Amino acid sequence: MFADFLKEIGIDGWWLKAVRKNDYRIECEHCIKDSKEQLLNRKRIDLFFIDEVNNWVIVIENKINSEVRFYSDGKHTQLNACQKYCRKNRKFRDYKTLHILLSYNKKNASYIEDSGDWQNADYYQVFKSLLKYTLEDAIITDYAKTLFAILFPQKNLNEAVSDLLHRNAWFYHHVISKLQ
């Protein structure tokens, strides 16, 4: 399933083969501890995929209803902290690394447009990669329902209706209309 998501966001080749080996573990809210750098210390990485057999990590920063945070220096973001952690940590610095920003917020995507270090992904791609598994697994079905409810909340008419309509139209055009 994870390989399907990577494929959906345009990741292929070596990464797909590596993920299909299934030698990795996933840590949610991976905590960066005991860093000498204030920028890194006690920060959290939303999803941290680690394969210690094949020496790779995948970092997924999840921004469903929030924006990428800048730190007090005004120059560095939490995305910079994630990258720096993977580069500087003795355990991971020689590992192959993939960074994914998961968000439907266009402002968040703009932070990574000029960087070759992060891959942008949105929740519609997650949803699309889950659809083929919903009949096989009740947990996936429940997650897909939850994700849909988060993406399309029941809002009052005077609350960001145009945003909701835009997301509905985008979802139909990019996901539903392409189902076979």
Which role fits each region the language model picked out?
Residues 1-180:
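Charged, terminal alpha-helix-loop-beta segments
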